[in-house]
């Protein structure tokens, strides 16, 4: 049975630490049917953040390295910095934090790069507190940080990084969704940039009630299918009739990539987060791996190189490294 996570449980910390380092993975948000609600992490790609406790009562970013360096060094304009500013303000901390961010996730890729930096920073900073705070409190500060990147508080990229696996994320709580261990995800990132704000602008305008009914039906089918380990239910529901039609025209090669995944027995395929990355679900790792070349070939057909990852849907959460 799916249960709501205990949002009051604090993450243990070693007292007296002055520096900590944490890793947070990339993630797939929306998952076709749960816009701003559903997400899951990816194994093997993510961001690492080193946080130092400093005497000055400020948050400052000392360095940003890796795949993406064109990010704000001003703490209030950076998701990781803003999250720690929120944490400091809430706890009235007399000390501050200095961050170094090592990016492993491409900018505006639809793979939750801003969320990964944000959560990694919070996990590391929490280890430096004399009394660590709960997962629920960290989540609220992460929502404040993520709002810097997207303009609104939404947790679909954040919740999975705190819990691991598929998570339903409201603004108040995180609910883990059981998924069969054998099910895997293929994520393909074409070497193109689609800014989150532009992707959200594409969603402006009116929607028909029938579209909401269809999307609600699909969400229910996917959740029921996951709960029952019923691939046929998931296959019937893993379709986005609300958001994908408005964003797909912004992604060159998307239609071909989606069709390639479905032709290789995907349970469903859609846009990862705001795009341009594409995700697909499969019943086995072998099936996901077999589909990867065809999906990448679809992007190559429109002149785009790409990277592909095959990971369990039940991939692990962010973790403290040192």
Curated annotation (Swiss-Prot):
UniProt catalytic activity: L-homoserine + ATP = O-phospho-L-homoserine + ADP + H(+)
UniProt subcellular location: Cytoplasm
UniProt entry keywords in alphabetical sequence: Amino-acid biosynthesis, ATP-binding, Cytoplasm, Kinase, Nucleotide-binding, Threonine biosynthesis, Transferase
GO molecular function (one): ATP binding
Gene Ontology CC terms, in alphabetical order: cytoplasm
Residues annotated as binding ATP: 106-116
Superkingdom of origin organism: Bacteria
Bilayer-crossing regions: none
Name of the molecule in the record: Homoserine kinase
EC number from the UniProt entry: 2.7.1.39
GO biological process, one term: threonine biosynthetic process
Enzyme class (EC, first level): transferase
Family of this protein: Belongs to the GHMP kinase family. Homoserine kinase subfamily.
Native species: Xanthomonas campestris pv. campestris (strain 8004)
Function: Catalyzes the ATP-dependent phosphorylation of L-homoserine to L-homoserine phosphate.
Record pathway: Amino-acid biosynthesis; L-threonine biosynthesis; L-threonine from L-aspartate: step 4/5
């Amino acid at each position: 049975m799916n249960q709501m996570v205990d949002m009051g449980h604090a993450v243990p910390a070693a007292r007296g630490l002055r520096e900590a380092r944490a890793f947070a993975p990339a993630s797939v948000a929306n998952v076709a049917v749960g816009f701003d609600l559903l997400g899951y992490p990816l194994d093997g790609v993510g961001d690492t953040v080193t946080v130092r406790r400093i005497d000055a009562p400020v948050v400052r970013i000392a360095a940003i390295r890796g795949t993406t360096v064109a990010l704000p060094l001003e703490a209030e304009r950076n998701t990781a910095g803003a999250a720690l500013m929120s944490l400091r303000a809430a706890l009235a901390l007399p000390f501050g934090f200095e961050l170094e961010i090592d990016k492993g996730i491409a900018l505006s890729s639809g793979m939750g790069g801003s969320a990964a930096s944000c959560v990694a920073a919070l996990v590391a900073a929490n280890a430096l507190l004399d009394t660590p705070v709960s997962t629920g409190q960290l989540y609220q500060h992460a929502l404040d940080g993520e709002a810097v990147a997207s303009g609104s508080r939404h947790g679909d990229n954040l919740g999975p990084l705190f819990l691991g696996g598929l998570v339903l994320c409201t603004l108040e709580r995180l609910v883990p969704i059981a998924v069969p261990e054998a099910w895997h995800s293929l994520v393909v990132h074409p070497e193109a940039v689609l800014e989150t704000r532009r992707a959200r602008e594409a969603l402006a305008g009116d929607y028909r009630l029938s579209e909401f009914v269809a999307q609600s039906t699909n969400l229910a089918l996917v959740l029921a299918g996951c709960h029952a380990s019923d691939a046929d239910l998931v296959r019937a529901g893993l379709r986005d009739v609300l958001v994908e039609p408005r964003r797909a025209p912004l992604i060159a090669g998307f239609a071909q990539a989606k069709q390639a995944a479905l032709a290789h027995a995907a349970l469903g395929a859609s846009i990862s987060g705001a795009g341009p990355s594409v995700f697909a679900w499969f019943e086995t790792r072998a099936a996901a791996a077999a589909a990867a070349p065809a999906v990448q070939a679809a992007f190559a057909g429109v002149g785009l190189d790409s990277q592909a990852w095959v990971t369990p849907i039940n991939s692990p959460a962010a973790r403290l490294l040192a």
